[in-house]
Amino acid sequence: MARVLLVEDEITVLILAESVVQELGHSTYSAGSVVQALALLEDPGEIDLLFTDIRLPEGDWGGFEVAEQARRKNPNLKVLYTTADTITDGMKVMFVAGGEMLPKPYTAPELAAASDCAPSSGGVAPDF
């Protein structure tokens, strides 16, 4: 069973993601903001997958910054990003180097498939 940190400011999307990930047999920790996510990352227990929205309502901080903080603690953390924004070529490079991308809107089967294949920063496939 994997431990998954979900970071999403849209409550209905967060509830959907929690439901899908829990249905896959994984435990979830949920944060509706960067502040909540950073507080959860202070817990000594490590997470196996970070699923985070890129754009969060905390000004200059968002999913990339949450992932950066999380990877300071766990450099091999698997990261899955999501956004409803248009993805630029520059952003695509970031995903290749640091995680996978699941664009919004996504379906429950798409989330299930993506959460089972998000690579770590070292390119190792997870064994959830």
Walk through the language-model features, giving the residues of each.
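Acidic, metal-coordinating helix/loop segments flanking the phosphotransfer/catalytic sites
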Residues: 30-49, 57
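Negatively charged, flexible loop motifs adjacent to catalytic sites
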Residues: 84-89
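As written
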Residues: 92-102
